[in-house]
Amino acid sequence: GYSISAGQRKLTRFLLNYHFNAQDIWWLRTKGMSEEFCEYLRTYQWKGDMYALPEGTVAYPHVQMVRIECDLVGAILIETYLLQTMNFHSLIATKATRVTGLNTHTPRSVMEFGTRRAQGESAGNDGAYAAVLGGCVGTANCLAEMKFGAEVKAVGTVAHSFIEFFPTEFDAFKAFADTYPDSVSLLLDTYNIMESGLPNLIKLDDYLIEKYPNDPNRRVKSARIDSGDLARGSKRLRKALDAAGKPYIKLVASNGLDEKKIANMELYEHAHFDSYGVGENLITSASDPVFGGVYKLVAVKQPDGGYTPKMKCSDSASKAIIPGKKMPWRLYDENGQAQCDLIAMDDEVIEAGKPVTMVNLDSDAIERTVTITPTKVKKLLVPHVLNGQLAIELPSIAEKKAYIAKQLTQETWESELRLECPHKHYVNMTPAVAECRSKMYAELHGGKV
């Protein structure tokens, strides 16, 4: 399996502006915080370093998404925000790549429709951003476009309530078209799709042709159905619209969709939809609603500049944290596909064209130690914040979308991308990391990993 690492943009901006205001200090005093500590926080600014995967990087278990280097107080203060931000953004961006078909190399047009089912305002806005990163063409959340810009485009159709308000369905359609003649997108299932919605759609488009005969842009752009047998409805509508000389009107489906329902309609029912609106199953990632990223202390810097590794143990050796200040690398074969990820100590250098000996993280692996010669290697963590200052030019959303698509189509094994029983990506350790982990686990917990 795979995930998409996201949230770096928001986390970076948070760290650059991290401080306590007067109201924060007042409230902390009411909770018994010492005057000395409150005074310390009054002038506190986060001055640490943040190394992270570039936003949109394909990520795997055990491989760090973010590495924080700062004072202990700063590391503790940002923990909850870091986890909330990275976990939620990564969850939705990953789900979006599945819904939009990027993982199966069959991209489809999907709009994010889930704001009303999101767990709160921030989830609605951040989820829209992450969904667009993962391949969605836009969102029904207008506030998201206002916050993030035109790359998170606000899209959608009219509501059932709008149509119900008017004396007739055609009156509603006409009112909308007269107000927004350049972006007429209608909803057909308020009353009866074939007996009412379709005839009124054709009537409205004929009205626009008569009103704007020399402006082909002022036509009905699309029509959505939100109930009933979607696949059957799409075929009936497509046939009727083509027969009426209106093949340019696109069909949109919504109503409890996810990647599996869409795939079933396309593969087995031959549905004729041009686009999909996906709501709660995307904005909540209903099939896998939790992204379990953790944030652990792995090393403490000493006065001489060296680092003492630290480790949180577990009765399950596989859950034991990998200690030490580390740097993950990605190793590629001659075809440009990622062979594996390699967790190395920060001062270790991995070189392309030279044999690399690795220890498999899976203790049950038949071959615990393997050696490969990668054609290309890439150090995965890049500095985003250094000494509290921005250290990277944050790419545009379009650049990040293209980056995600390139990885999924050119660099990731198809077997890792499938929905059912995906192949497990190889994540290995250098011998130095493996030895440090095994030695510390034996000392602290009395066993071996």
Give the predicted meaning of each segment.
Residues G1-R29:
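Intrinsically disordered, low-complexity, positively charged segments
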Residues R13-L16, A52-E55, A59:
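An N-terminal, globular interaction/scaffold subdomain
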Residues I25-W27, T94-R98, G114, E416-P422:
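Short coil/turn segments at secondary-structure boundaries
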Residues G32, C38-K47, G56-P247, L257-N264, ...:
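Buried, small/hydrophobic-residue-enriched core segments of structured protein domains
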Residues G48, L53-P54, V252:
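A structural connector/turn signal
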Residues S185-L187, V252, G277:
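Structural detector of well-ordered beta-strand residues that form the stable sheet scaffold
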